[in-house]
Amino acid sequence: MATTEATLYEIKHGAAWITLNRPENRNALSSVLVTELYDHLMAANADDSVRSIVITGNGPAFCAGADLKSPPGQLSEGSDRAVPYADVLTTIIDSPKPVIAAINGAAFAGGLGLVGASDIVVTREDVQFSF
C-alpha cells in the first residue's frame, strides 16, 4: 500500500483503491490531495493489472468539498506541481477503466464532482449529498 499525506493507494484483487485520507477535516480537497488523487488515477490507468478503480474516503465523510483552510497551490513534499481539480474530473470521466465511487459518508460540494464523474456509485442509505 502506498501511503502519502492525503491519500492511500492499494491494489486488491485487480481493483485500485484510492482512499481520501484526511478524516480530520472530512477529506476536504486540498491542492495536495487533488494532486495525489490525480497521480493515483494516472498510475491505475497505466497499470495493466488494474481492471477497475475505486475511490472512497477515510473516516465519517466521503469528501466535504474544497479545503478552505489550505493555501491554493500548496505543494506536497517533493512535488513541483499542483494539479487543477478539473484535471482530476476529466481523468475520471476519460478513464478506460470503470471508476467506482464508494461513498462511506457525506459528500458535499466538490465531493459531488467526484461522485458525478464516476461510472458507478455505491453508497449506504444514510449518506448525505449536498451542494
Name each model feature, range by range.
Residues 18, 55, 67, 114-116:
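Hydrophobic/aromatic residues within transmembrane alpha-helices
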Residues 91-131:
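Glycine-rich beta-to-alpha active-site loop
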Residues 35, 57-94, 107:
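Glycine- (often His-adjacent) and acidic-residue-rich active-site loop
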Residues 21, 27, 57-59, 65, ...:
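Conserved phosphate-binding and hydrolysis motifs of nucleotide-dependent enzymes
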